[in-house]
Amino acid sequence: IPTLVMQIQKCSKLYTAECKMHKIVTHDDKVSLHGKFMETDYNIDLPVGSRKVAIPMDATIKAYIDFSSFSEASILRNGDKLNVVLPDPKVQLTSTSINHEEVKQFVALTRSRFTDEELTNYEQQGRKAIIADIPQTNIVEQARESAARILIPMFVQMGFKEADITVSFRKDFNKNNIGLL
């Protein structure tokens, strides 16, 4: 078992799944007058024109298994049977890119163009939206399957039969708790 632990700990972080996402962040900016007059709320769009922007974003999300806390307690051997309990996959947004040539703006003549600060703010909102959409992907399940496909051959090389090896994880995730990764 110590040899197994040492072999697995050599991996440190094992990146097992990657997901590419494309998102178009849009914003519609109208000038309006809000207020209250004689206890009546009003909201009037002013005819000075509107501004619209569409920002295409590409993002890369990666899932990995962090073996820094992996120990002998994670491996249970019962005769020829081997049960390996792996740490839960972790998910991170590793990169985002914006094709600036594809950014589209519509600005009425009576309005000013979007400032760099406004565009940066919309890009940040896009990144947050991508992170919020991670639970809809199946990247955690892909990471688990890939980790098993990578580790089982290592155990087979050490003399175990593939049919006697069970790889499991600590926790089952659903869309309500996947954001905790």
Map each language-model feature to its residues.
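Domain-level marker for long, solvent-exposed, non-transmembrane regions
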Residues: 1-181
